[in-house]
Amino acid sequence: MNPLALTIFLLSLAIGTTITLSSFHWLLAWIGLEINTLAIIPLMTKTPHPRAIEAATKYFLTQAAASALVLFSSLISAWQTGEWSINSLMDLPMNILSIALMMKLGLAPLHFWIPEVLQGISLPTGLILSTWQKIAPMALLLQTSHLINLNLTIALGLTSIMVGGWGGIGQTQLRKIMAFSSIGHLGWIIVILKFDPQLSLLNFVLYIIMTAAMFMSLTTISATKMLEISTSWSKTPALTTTTMLILLSLAGLPPLTGFTPKLLITLELVKQNATLLAVMVMFISLLALFFYIRLTYVVTLTLSPNTPNSLLTWRTASRSYSTTAIMNTMALILLPITPTLLLL
């Protein structure tokens, strides 16, 4: 792709998200979401492959339907209250808006587009889709968290955690595994949204850090299938080791970063007398833990047959991977500074 065109599309992504984050008017928020949607489609079709075209089409249709629902809910709200303010929503438009934003995020049972879209695009575009594209809808959900229906968030959150774990078990494609991982993590974020929006925000930030680190590692290794990542040990042992630890962090095992949100959410649910919900969330999450540990086993504990000559790979001038190293570090060792993060 032309570097100038790429710069314009990336700037459009940044501008769209910024407009949505800084808006108090529903029309401006909707415009920001639309700019975001339209800016990423050329990035998806950067490689003219039928799978990429199919992924971009599915993404556009889903996001267009969700944007129509956002506009519909804001029109109903303006008709009922006479205001276009984001915080002046009645029950019906709030429920419609919640469903629309959760469709944009890819929460179950509105998750049908995420695995197929991620499978059809490149890893760098998948990184943008899994992290940056979720900021604007999540910001709108956080702004309206005091109005959102508690039963709706709990139902969709539990469904997402279950679908995220169940769907990832039989997968061998790493992008689909990351798609179901994203669905599961967003389920955790939505479950706690009504109880403690600040904790949802912390969980979302940590989700972005861990997901970005995983996508950057996969991009560096150039792995899109489980077979490819299982043979990467002989080429990049250090990066493969950190990739294994990031997988365990995504699974939520202590003492890694991913344990932080799960611990805090469980404690908050118990504090809010929702102990049964906390137990259900933890038990359902064991499904996701299974496929994370399975992938970890494939990455580190299985070595493909290779001769000593295969270890001597041709080495060109090495590129700097400082950003990947920084993200990997943050995805692993943020647990000790959690009290500091909570005070920010």
Curated annotation (Swiss-Prot):
EC number: 7.1.1.2
Places the protein is found: Mitochondrion inner membrane
Broad enzyme group: translocase
Catalytic activity of the protein: a ubiquinone + NADH + 5 H(+)(in) = a ubiquinol + NAD(+) + 4 H(+)(out)
Annotated signal sequence range: none
CC terms in the record's Gene Ontology section: mitochondrial inner membrane
Transmembrane annotation, as ranges: 1-21, 24-44, 59-79, 94-114, 121-141, 150-170, 177-197, 201-221, 245-265, 273-293, 324-344
Membrane topology, as annotated: Multi-pass membrane protein
Disulfide-linked positions: none
UniProt entry tagged with the keyword Ion transport: no
InterPro entries per record: Complex_I_Subunit_2 (IPR050175), NADH_DH_su2_C (IPR010933), NADH_UbQ_OxRdtase_chain2 (IPR003917), ND/Mrp_TM (IPR001750)
GO biological process, one term: mitochondrial electron transport, NADH to ubiquinone
GO molecular function, one term: NADH dehydrogenase (ubiquinone) activity
Keyword entries, A-Z: Electron transport, Membrane, Mitochondrion, Mitochondrion inner membrane, NAD, Respiratory chain, Translocase, Transmembrane, Transmembrane helix, Transport, Ubiquinone
Family statement drawn from the similarity comment of this UniProt entry: Belongs to the complex I subunit 2 family.
Function description: Core subunit of the mitochondrial membrane respiratory chain NADH dehydrogenase (Complex I) that is believed to belong to the minimal assembly required for catalysis. Complex I functions in the transfer of electrons from NADH to the respiratory chain. The immediate electron acceptor for the enzyme is believed to be ubiquinone.
Protein known as: NADH-ubiquinone oxidoreductase chain 2
Gene name in the database record: MT-ND2
